[in-house]
Curated annotation (Swiss-Prot):
CDD domains: ASKHA_NBD_YjiL-like. SUPFAM superfamilies: Actin-like ATPase domain. The keyword Electron transport does not apply. Binds 1 [4Fe-4S] cluster per dimer. It comes from Methanocaldococcus jannaschii (strain ATCC 43067 / DSM 2661 / JAL-1 / JCM 10045 / NBRC 100440). This is Uncharacterized protein MJ0004. The keyword Metal-binding applies.
Amino acid sequence: MILGIDVGSTTTKMVLMEDSKIIWYKIEDIGVVIEEDILLKMVKEIEQKYPIDKIVATGYGRHKVSFADKIVPEVIALGKGANYFFNEADGVIDIGGQDTKVLKIDKNGKVVDFILSDKCAAGTGKFLEKALDILKIDKNEINKYKSDNIAKISSMCAVFAESEIISLLSKKVPKEGILMGVYESIINRVIPMTNRLKIQNIVFSGGVAKNKVLVEMFEKKLNKKLLIPKEPQIVCCVGAILV
């Protein structure tokens, strides 16, 4: 059995696979700040239930897994993981905490081309997280907030966009409308990236893909359905195992 560990900026994902089948997985709400001894302890707990033959690491905080047998770059892992879940995929959108990645892949999941957004852009998972903090919206309640009145957030920079959110709140603009504006801001940063790579069958991976309202807006803007795995947060981890 192979254990994959994907240490992201905000979450850590672990997946156990045998003969290309997912046996077990877990998602922890702690990312790159996780200590290596904590990771080792988690691995030892898994080893009490399953025999681990090999450990592979990926993600923004992959350096925290120095005990891994193999390190796989995120972009390569994402392509392979997307292909595992949807073999018709020719593209991937991954909105991570630190950046947004858009990939063009071939029929084997090999990355042909990719674009990374600026980590300072108002289009990352971290920006969405910060917006939720300002709006005092629990991330677990996020799908309850929806509105047809979309507030305009025009800044390309996350810091200035956050200032716009505070300004809109002070003007008594409803939270729902501001949140929809945040979604639109994120989507508007990603669509030019997908257009540039000319991708059609797109896998949406990462925690943001669990946001039903954002996905609905995204699909409307793209005029197509996105391919979303049952658990979109483990795509990169699965791909790292399969590389």
